[in-house]
Design a protein with these regions (language model features):
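Electropositive, gly/pro-rich neighborhoods at or near active sites that engage anionic ligands
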Residues: 1-146
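Redox- and metal-dependent alpha/beta enzyme cores, enriched for Fe-S-associated oxidoreductases
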Residues: 158-183
Length: 183
């Protein structure tokens, strides 16, 4: 039942136009409105749970870089840890898709945070923000940036808002762009 089996593929722009025509003709504002609302509610409940808050705030001494860490180095490391954990939550779709996520324990969240954080743009992203995860020789490298944040999926937006608040607390100016229609 794969759409490419019959060699019929509809370009995404055409598909979007056809959906818009259907919605305009049927006077349905958004057929997925209830599902989007449930995703946002699930994500908000997961983020607000004691288990999630506890895991986000848990810190081991070795996380700060050892016993000879400086205050500047510790602050830099804390920024890195907090942002990394929030970004990890932003890609954990189960938080807003599955009901089981409401029953995650602190250990479940800590296992999520222990996953390797990789990708082509990870180092460049943290460097752009001035968050290196370690103390730099020249002191703090945090220079406020202007960031365009694209928010496009219900559920995920709840985590995005927490990340945006963190970036604003760090002095960055964040402009949020939403896709057309309710998120």
């Amino acid at each position: 039942d794969h759409e490419t089996r019959d060699e019929i593929m509809v370009p995404s722009r055409l598909e979007k136009r056809l959906v818009n025509i259907f919605l305009n003709r049927t006077q349905i504002s958004d057929p997925y409105l209830c599902e989007k609302g449930m995703r946002n509610l699930r994500a908000a409940r997961s983020l607000g749970s004691a288990a999630c808050r506890g895991a986000l705030n848990r810190l081991a001494v070795q996380d700060l870089g050892g016993s000879r860490s400086t205050l500047a180095g510790a602050r830099e490391r804390l920024r890195f840890i907090e942002l990394k954990r929030l970004l990890t939550l932003a890609v954990e779709e189960a938080l807003w898709v599955e009901e089981d996520a409401l029953h995650y324990t602190e250990e479940n969240y800590l296992r999520l945070f222990d996953r390797p954080f990789t990708g082509d743009g990870v180092d460049a992203f943290f460097a752009f923000l001035g968050i290196q995860g370690r103390a730099s020789a020249d002191g703090p490298s945090l220079v406020p940036k202007k960031i365009l944040w694209l928010a496009d999926e219900s559920g995920e937006i709840m985590v995005d808002l927490v990340i945006i608040r963190l970036l604003a607390r760090l002095g960055h100016k964040v402009v949020v762009a939403f896709k057309d229609g309710p998120v």
